[in-house]
UniProtKB/Swiss-Prot annotation:
Record remark on domains: Each HEAT repeat appears to consist of two alpha helices joined by a hydrophilic region, the intrarepeat loop. The repeat units may be arranged laterally to form a rod-like structure.
Stored InterPro entries: ARM-like (IPR011989), ARM-type_fold (IPR016024), HEAT (IPR000357), HEAT_type_2 (IPR021133), PP2A/SF3B1-like_HEAT (IPR054573), PP2A_Regulatory_Subunit_A (IPR051023)
Family statement drawn from the similarity comment of this UniProt entry: Belongs to the phosphatase 2A regulatory subunit A family.
Entries under Pfam families matching the protein: HEAT, HEAT_2, PPP2R1A-like_HEAT
Name of the gene encoding the protein in the UniProt record: PPP2R1A
Protein name: Serine/threonine-protein phosphatase 2A 65 kDa regulatory subunit A alpha isoform
UniProt organism field: Bos taurus (Bovine)
Swiss-Prot/TrEMBL keywords: Acetylation, Cell membrane, Cell projection, Centromere, Chromosome, Chromosome partition, Cytoplasm, Membrane, Nucleus, Repeat
Compartments (UniProt record): Cytoplasm; Nucleus; Chromosome; Chromosome, Centromere
Length: 589
């Protein structure tokens, strides 16, 4: 390649070569990330004739550099002269698609898929398809796995003779000796099926699907379950029973729990793909078995799908199927030995209320909710409480309130701070559903207790919780019930609690407005400017800066300004700094 002697146009390429050969990975990475700038400077012709061959030859670098290169090349079409020259990008990407590191290969495949759309049909056949064939017939499994992701993007736009060849290559990959290749083929089978003609789906994809679904490796079989969804969507209803269902039944009872888990995980999609009749005859019994599976992971995956499955049952049989076939299984899952299973069920079970309506909810679901509210696992109780809105719409929450209260109190005092945090986040929702009287009587004291929790994240969440409660119940309520308690904390011996008063005033002032802030909260803030602890004093300055915009100008001048000016003379540097900042921001300086 030409040297950079006195020729400015060559300068960027010289820098690039120097940096690409530099010992320092970071420099090599930076130069790769600037590749588009360099290509622009070189122009399309030299990018094609010099830069790309150079890059193709240097593919033996750190994975991070190769990953950046694979990504860059996917956006290079205009830099090589547009679609008619896009095939020049194939050699470096082909090399990248064969490297050992999976992340690099995947990125190269992603870029190849992107630029495939910019090839004309004749260029696809002349350049892209030969690349796919080379990768698919490569000696290393890495190139064969990469090939699997390239069939669906070129298949629709090539001649029928080439299509037949591509199908043959894909068939070979599905029966490759290496499990990693069969896995890659299984994971792309569904998307390949989508671009095939229906006759070929029936005659060629279905046999591949059946073979992969009975592969000796469970990691291959479980990917065939994913493909099943796509294939079932493509076939007419009358073919499903013969072509797909035997394989699906076999997967639902597979000896490997990972395959059964995949069936449970994809159940909603499978259900929609096969339609109401097959659901009634086949999927309902299969779902019952998955809910009773011996492996907890499978039961948990099925539990997650309970609500969606019931929602999607056809209206004529929905209630009957739920009451006679699904509910008995749910009742067993409520007292499952595994807490993940119970927790998964608790996150969706409330959603059955709107489906079953008021009477069935009260008779059948309510006892289950109450049992779950008393469960020893906090996640179960939390999941029930966080989904109360579904039930509230159907039966009103009063039915639950007697059991709710002990559950809420227990969670509010749970030893794990993350559990306490989660219940705080649901408090505004609960408050809105339970009403102000119930809240004041039973929950107000909890909300105040959180303000003095020993974990800062809880105190912080409790503060913003107060704001949301005032938004729900109004500022008069705040004035009567919350503000007096918050202000009382300003005399607490613990300086952290005194600071919490300031944090609460910051957020309450936003929702309570000028009148309440000026008359009731400001005097406390101003008084706290004389606190013995510097941390409290500088938070006074921050609070005044925060609530200043809410106050009227005369209050700012007569009450706030003197206090801030006094704080600028404080012996503590932080107090001085924040007081000065507040004066500046409020335009009082």
């Amino acid at each position: 390649m030409a040297a950079a002697d006195g020729d400015d146009s060559l300068y960027p390429i010289a820098v690039l070569i120097d940096e690409l050969r530099n010992e320092d990975v970071q420099l090599r990475l930076n130069s790769i990330k600037k590749l588009s700038t360099i290509a622009l400077a070189l122009g399309v012709e030299r990018t094609r004739s010099e830069l790309l061959p150079f890059l193709t030859d240097t593919i033996y670098d750190e994975d991070e550099v190769l990953l950046a290169l694979a990504e860059q090349l996917g956006t290079f079409t205009t830099l090589v002269g547009g679609p008619e020259y896009v095939h020049c990008l194939l050699p470096p990407l082909e090399s990248l698609a064969t490297v050992e590191e999976t992340v690099v290969r995947d990125k190269a495949v992603e870029s190849l898929r992107a630029i495939s759309h910019e090839h004309s049909p004749s260029d696809l056949e002349a350049h892209f398809v030969p690349l796919v064939k080379r990768l698919a017939g490569g000696d290393w499994f890495t190139s064969r796995t990469s090939a699997c992701g390239l069939f669906s993007v070129c298949y629709p736009r090539v001649s029928s003779a080439v299509k037949a060849e591509l199908r043959q290559y894909f068939r070979n990959l599905c029966s490759d000796d290496t499990p990693m290749v069969r896995r890659a083929a299984a994971s792309k089978l569904g998307e390949f099926a989508k671009v095939l003609e229906l006759d070929n789906v029936k005659s060629e994809i279905i046999p591949m699907f059946s073979n992969l679904a009975s592969d000796e490796q469970d990691s291959v079989r479980l990917l065939a379950v994913e493909a099943c969804v796509n294939i079932a969507q493509l076939l007419p209803q009358e073919d499903l029973e013969a072509l797909v269902m035997p394989t699906l039944r076999q997967a639902a009872e597979d000896k490997s729990w990972r395959v059964r888990y995949m069936v449970a995980d994809k159940f909603t999609e499978l259900h929609k793909a096969v339609g109401p009749e097959i659901t009634k005859t086949d999927l309902v019994p299969a779902f019952q078995n998955l809910m009773k599976d011996c492996e907890a992971e499978v039961r948990a995956a099925a539990s997650h799908k309970v609500k969606e499955f019931c929602e999607n049952l056809s209206a004529d049989c929905r209630e009957n199927v739920i009451m006679t076939q699904i509910l008995p299984c749910i009742k067993e899952l409520v007292s499952d030995a595994n807490q993940h299973v119970k927790s998964a069920l608790a996150s969706v079970i409330m959603g059955l209320s709107p489906i079953l309506g008021k009477d069935s909810t009260i008779e059948h679901l309510l006892p289950l909710f109450l049992a779950q509210l008393k469960d020893e696992c906090p996640e179960v109780r939390l999941n029930i409480i966080s989904n109360l809105d579904c039930v509230n719409e159907v039966i009103g929450i009063r039915q639950l309130s007697q059991s709710l209260l002990p559950a809420i109190v227990e969670l509010a005092e749970d030893a794990k701070w993350r559990v306490r945090l989660a219940i705080i986040e649901y408090m505004p929702l609960l408050a809105g559903q339970l009403g102000v009287e119930f809240f004041d009587e039973k929950l107000n004291s909890l909300c105040m207790a959180w303000l003095v929790d020993h974990v800062y994240a809880i105190r912080e969440a409790a503060t913003s919780n107060l704001k949301k409660l005032v938004e729900k119940f109004g500022k008069e309520w705040a004035h009567a019930t919350i503000i007096p308690k918050v202000l009382a904390m300003s005399g607490d011996p613990n300086y952290l609690h005194r600071m919490t008063t300031l944090f609460c005033i910051n957020v309450l002032s936003e929702v309570c407005g000028q009148d309440i802030t000026t008359k009731h909260m400001l005097p406390t803030v101003l008084r706290m400017a004389g606190d013995p602890v510097a941390n409290v004093r500088f938070n006074v300055a921050k609070s005044l800066q925060k609530i200043g915009p809410i106050l009227d100008n005369s209050t700012l001048q007569s009450e706030v300004k003197p206090v801030l000016e006094k704080l600028t003379q404080d012996q503590d540097v932080d107090v001085k700094y924040f007081a000065q900042e507040a004066l500046t921001v409020l335009s009082l300086a």
